[in-house]
Amino acid sequence: MTSAPTSCIRWFRDLSLTDLPLVGGKNASLGEMFQQLTPLGVRIPDGFAVTAEAYRDALDESDAWVQLHRALDGLDKRDIAALARAGAKAREIVYGAPMPKHVETTIREAWREMKARFGEDLSVAVRSSATAEDLPTASFAGQHDTYLNIRGEETLLDAVKRCQASLFTDRAISYRID
């Protein structure tokens, strides 16, 4: 069963390094490995990536960009208390932005496809793969949150939102300011 590409998700089997702007470095690399190594007998886990476009859709539809700029513009990262307040506010804004219905539906359908392929006991990891991660000038390794042993659609949707919000952990904000 092969799903058609959507603007919300991409299957690892359909990704390559050219997709880095769409799904980030980790996901693009997983896709590249899947395509190159699976035919050679190397077992690479299949799964899907939620695209940067899906993230932007959520923030666009909830008009969150203005709130994020208000929370973060002019922030002095040396003021630890201000950084903590701004980070908490930014995470609240992103986590609170409703997931667009088309994104939610697409993620649910992808989850169901994975369950059909891998079984009812399926558990997955939800990891960041920011499009700015692991660039030649910066490595964002360890700056964002990872969620392991995710089971069930509701838990998956929540983990996706929490992972997206983790783009604004205090350490990630501070790192980006540098």
Where do the protein language model's features map onto the residues?
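N-terminal beta-alpha lobe that positions the nucleotide/phosphoryl donor
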Residues: 1-178
